[in-house]
């Protein structure tokens, strides 16, 4: 366990995995407040509910394109670009004045999640084989579940102050970026595939 977690690339991939849970359920505690704030907008109830499902729709549509982009531009670069776009699009809801614009930002967020998920999964395949990959997948599931619990709980707390503060949680990706950059780009070494024997 400790050998795997001492690999900063493994830790970076776990951090990236923890972001993906943010895309949908995190804003759920803020939905009633968002709908109330934009009650004068036509179809506000429908648009508010689409804020949750829009990212998943874009992930489904863009995942194949993200796979091609990862092969074309590099998985590490796509991961970093995805995390940056994730942070910017996700946190945009704090300042956008219109429900339609917030929905548009959620669609862009889905594109970012497709970038992160696709490149992260590809890098896991590059870096780990056999038992090491199995152990990593277990850690990834734990990181995702723990991230979901923490982020949703924190979102509920923030929504008690202001519903739009929930969108600030997406900026956590900006805190991850320096570590991700150090893990994947600073060394200039490509990921290596570990094989038995």
Language model segments and positions:
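Extracellular/periplasmic helix-loop-helix junction of adjacent transmembrane segments
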Residues: 31-60
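Extracytoplasmic
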Residues: 9-39
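Helix-loop-helix hairpin linking two adjacent transmembrane segments in secondary transporters
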Residues: 139-184
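Residue-level signature of mid-helix packing/kink "hotspots" within the transmembrane helices
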Residues: 25, 56-64, 148-149
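Interfacial helix-cap and linker-helix signal at transmembrane-aqueous boundaries
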Residues: 34-35, 69-70, 154-160
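A generic transmembrane-helix signature of 12-TM secondary carrier transporters
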Residues: 83, 87-90, 105-106, 171, ...
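Conserved MFS/SLC helix-loop-helix module at the cytosolic interface between two early adjacent transmembrane helices
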Residues: 60-98
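Cytoplasmic helix-loop-helix junction between adjacent transmembrane helices
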Residues: 99, 105-144
């Amino acid at each position: 366990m400790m050998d795997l977690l001492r690999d900063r690339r493994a830790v970076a991939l776990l951090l990236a995995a923890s972001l993906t849970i943010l895309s949908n359920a995190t804003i759920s505690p803020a939905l009633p407040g968002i709908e109330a704030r934009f009650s004068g907008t036509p179809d506000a109830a429908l648009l508010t509910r689409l804020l949750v499902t829009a990212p998943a729709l874009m992930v489904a549509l863009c995942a194949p394109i993200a796979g091609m982009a990862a092969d074309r531009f590099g998985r590490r670069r796509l991961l970093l670009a995805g995390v940056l776009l994730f942070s910017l699009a996700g946190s945009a809801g704090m300042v956008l004045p219109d429900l339609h614009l917030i929905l548009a930002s959620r669609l862009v967020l889905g594109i970012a999640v497709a970038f992160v998920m696709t490149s992260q999964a590809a890098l896991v395949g590059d870096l780990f084989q056999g038992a090491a990959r199995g152990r990593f997948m277990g850690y990834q599931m734990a990181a995702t579940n723990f991230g979901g619990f923490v982020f949703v709980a924190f979102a509920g707390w923030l929504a008690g102050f202001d519903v739009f503060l929930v969108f600030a949680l997406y900026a956590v990706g900006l805190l991850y970026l320096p570590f991700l950059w150090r893990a994947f780009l600073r060394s200039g070494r490509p990921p290596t595939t570990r094989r038995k024997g």
